[in-house]
């Protein structure tokens, strides 16, 4: 029952990872959208380490101190720290990241080396040549 109460009142998040969408735009381009309502760009960190995309919220110590001074009757909107991580192939390159209306969008593409890209081979048509001997 305590667990149910804490979920209903929002005292503990159901998940520390934010919701996200991953969309394939075409053969080589993708977009990752992460729901981060209430976060400013200064409070978010996006990095790639060892082919792992990491998205983290950064703690704000000053705001935590200010929050402690408030006498909450009910606090249903929480802004908890989170960390979400995705393993990337070495061929994935990030184009950009932007934050708009509480959604962090990352655009990335599959950078296939030229030697791995499909190549069309043209077919020549040979004409029959008759030899007159």
Swiss-Prot record:
Belongs to the small heat shock protein (HSP20) family. It comes from the Bacteria. Keywords: Plasmid, Stress response. InterPro entries: A-crystallin/Hsp20_dom, ACD_IbpA/B, HSP20-like_chaperone. Pfam families: HSP20 (PF00011). Residues 11-126 form the sHSP domain. This is Small heat shock protein ibp. SUPFAM superfamilies: HSP20-like chaperones.
């Amino acid at each position: 029952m305590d667990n149910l109460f804490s979920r209903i009142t929002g005292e503990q998040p159901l998940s520390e990872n934010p919701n996200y969408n991953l969309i394939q735009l075409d053969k080589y381009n993708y977009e990752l959208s992460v729901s981060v309502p209430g976060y400013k760009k200064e409070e978010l960190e996006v990095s790639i380490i060892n082919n792992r995309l990491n998205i983290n919220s950064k703690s704000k110590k000053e705001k935590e101190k200010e929050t402690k001074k408030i006498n909450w009757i009910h606090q249903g909107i929480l802004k908890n720290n989170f960390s979400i991580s995705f393993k990337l192939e070495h061929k994935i390159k990030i184009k950009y990241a932007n934050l708009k209306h509480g959604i962090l969008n990352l655009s990335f593409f599959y950078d296939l080396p030229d030697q791995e890209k499909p190549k069309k081979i043209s077919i020549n048509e040979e004409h029959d040549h008759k030899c007159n001997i």
